[in-house]
Amino acid sequence: MSTNFWELLQQHQGDLTKSGRTVAEYLVQHAAEAQYLSISSLARECQVAEATVFRFCRALGFEGYHEMRIALAQANATGVLVNQQEPAPDADTATLCEHASALFMTAINGTQNALSPQAVEQAVVLLHSARQVFCMGQGGSMAAANEICARFACITNKFRAVADSHMQVMAASLMTEQDVVLFVSYSGATRDLMETLRTAKANGAKVILITHYEDSPGAKLADIVLLCGAQESPLDSGSIPIKVAVLYVAEVLVLRYILDDKPGSTEAQERTTEALAVKLL
């Protein structure tokens, strides 16, 4: 679909229902913020049902919400409502360095504000009591899950990473109430995520989800939700600041985990450090 989002909205204004016009008015007034919202979040902000938002998208000619959100982000980036975080086309490298630094600091600060200390403490209780902890994700989120698994490997051998979506659901099918899933998903709304979490929950496993959307389908299945406050545009999928924000959450988990069992963690760190010493030249 090549037509600009705002042109489409103007063309189909007369086709919208009263509640559809409520959605349209919100998008006009909050265009920059709306491109980051999930369908459930947008519905809540507009005080309408998710089905109303979906019908709004179809009325404009989109297949669904995701396609509409991408079109909105494209319009924001190229139209009058320019993304203020985008560097100028002629920016020099020094400016780009400052820009990147600002993105990372914004991601970390946003996550610090969103992350619940109580949720972290509850998550660590589950991690300590677990027989096994399965670190999972898809795409760029799986890269972060691998990093989390590697970080915990210095202090415990109960963590394992499962990358393939088929292997994830297979692992979930063999879980028990002694197991924990630590799933990384920015959207909290992918088919593979939902399939794996449903299977894990059916077998009694606990679920910890690191996500940006506390009202996402995945969050509704999770026992504990750890919020990543960094915002990602649909046009910037896989951004590194998002991964850094996720790893910030992971580091808080690690620090709490260590302090809650300082003697055991210290011994484990000493043993793994000694084991790695022979690898150095």
Task: Give the positions of each predicted feature.
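A short, charged, Gly/Pro-tolerant segment at domain boundaries
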Residues: 263-281
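HTH-adjacent hinge/linker in prokaryotic transcriptional regulators
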Residues: 2-7, 15, 22, 29-36, ...
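Glycine-rich phosphate-binding loops that contact phosphosugars or nucleotide phosphates
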Residues: 128-248, 254-261
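Glycine-rich phosphate/diphosphate-binding loops that line cofactor/substrate pockets in enzymes
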Residues: 118-130
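CheY-like receiver
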Residues: 8, 26, 123-126, 171
